[in-house]
Amino acid sequence: MAMASLARRKAYFLTRNISNSPTDAFRFSFSLTRGFASSGSDDNDVVIIGGGPGGYVAAIKAAQLGLKTTCIEKRGALGGTCLNVGCIPSKALLHSSHMYHEAKHVFANHGVKVSSVEVDLPAMLAQKDTAVKNLTRGVEGLFKKNKVNYVKGYGKFLSPSEVSVDTIDGENVVVKGKHIIVATGSDVKSLPGITIDEKKIVSSTGALSLTEIPKKLIVIGAGYIGLEMGSVWGRLGSEVTVVEFAADIVPAMDGEIRKQFQRSLEKQKMKFMLKTKVVGVDSSGDGVKLIVEPAEGGEQTTLEADVVLVSAGRTPFTSGLDLEKIGVETDKGGRILVNERFSTNVSGVYAIGDVIPGPMLAHKAEEDGVACVEFIAGKHGHVDYDKVPGVVYTYPEVASVGKTEEQLKKEGVSYNVGKFPFMANSRAKAIDTAEGMVKILADKETDKILGVHIMSPNAGELIHEAVLAINYDASSEDIARVCHAHPTMSEAIKEAAMATYDKPIHM
């Protein structure tokens, strides 16, 4: 790495000035569930409404920075949508369903004979629930360790420095704070004319807890969540049809990778109806009838399924907080408007995560939370939304960071492209997972890496070499000259980097 790059690294860490000073002693005025919540009769330095990834991480970081902190969470369990009914339970089911699929269809190719493979759905769901329970308890343990006050209840603003909380025990308390952070996350976006009952017409929450494997499943929406949940039930035996209004699945994905990805899902018998609009639904019978037509208009078709999953995106959860009472500005979509320091237009009130503009991702919310409380503590905080990775946790996975080829063309940026397929990677061939590729986009003049896109069974783990490289303005040659262990899947990144500025060795 060049000396200039090393200097940038040193400057970066010096300017962050992150402190881990111990917190002040806390005084607890009364006890709620689990015995470590406070009424907040003494002013807090920081009060956080919402205990999801953004909220609980902000709370812990604030306490580590010596700020007296209270976190309010309506669910009664920390972790938000991600931990309770999103990222974590879906990954548990994705893994369990993949294990079943491998045992049924792949083990024999590796000399492992299994006479009978069956799905024990109750046991599979129980494993998922156990994982969630253990992790939520773990976050509570972190709150205790860091002396974060935890109030279980629904909070809404009384003033810019006061939050009224209806606790899960039926009490009402007022929590006061010098700085209040809104971290209430997002909720499922509904579609006109479709009522989610979480039985036959389900959201992602209901799709995580189906008590029977549907023979036919229709997924409305070809985004991350819809494709992941469609994959779970497809592996377990459901006939899956994905209905999408747009012309492509996961529209924000790099086009070349997306085409490969769709072909892979189609090989897994997932069907796609793109450029298709849902115009009606009938769930009065035993199953569900979905009426669709071409997005541009035309002849209607009726689709039948046992279960319909509505996965048409998410909307910020900002209603019911009495934001208008204190004058906090939101946009037309209900997102809270903030500046680069996460401050709203109301002094002392901040917002992070899914309730503000930007990608609705748990890890982005976590970074927001850390940066926000660093600003509050008088330190340097920073989140670069152009360098936040995204992962689709199907099989294979797709992971990306930075710009797509389509974005660079639109912006008029001259770039080089380097690609390397996993079919030429020795580790991938040895373990029979050679599907996919690594694609690197770099500035044509400077060789600075602008985007990296990976399709591979473990793309979500591989992408972080690229995330680090992009955050430190590395070039493709920088990656190419780093020794990678052999044989590993990560060698494909090195080879793609070599292909970007020169030529790969193994192609």
Curated annotation (Swiss-Prot):
Residues where NAD(+) binds: G221, A222, G223, Y224, I225, G226, L227, E228, E244, V278, G313
Stated name of the protein: Dihydrolipoyl dehydrogenase 2, mitochondrial
One Gene Ontology molecular-function label: ATP binding
Active site: H486 (proton acceptor)
Keywords assigned by UniProt, alphabetized: Disulfide bond, FAD, Flavoprotein, Mitochondrion, NAD, Oxidoreductase, Redox-active center, Transit peptide
Binding, FAD: 73-82, 91, 155, 184-186, 354, 360-363
Record's function text: Lipoamide dehydrogenase is a component of the glycine decarboxylase (GDC) or glycine cleavage system as well as of the alpha-ketoacid dehydrogenase complexes. LPD1 is probably the protein most often associated with the glycine decarboxylase complex while LPD2 is probably incorporated into alpha-ketoacid dehydrogenase complexes.
EC number of this enzyme: 1.8.1.4
Gene assigned in the entry: LPD2
Processing after translation: S-nytrosylated at unknown positions.
Essential cofactor(s): FAD
Disulfide bridge positions per record: C82-C87
Tissue expression pattern: Preferentially expressed in roots, flowers and siliques and at a lower level in stems and leaves.
Primary subcellular site in the record, as a coarse category: mitochondrion
Top-rank taxon: Eukaryota
Annotated knockout phenotype: No visible phenotype, probably due to redundancy with LPD1.
Annotated signal peptide: none
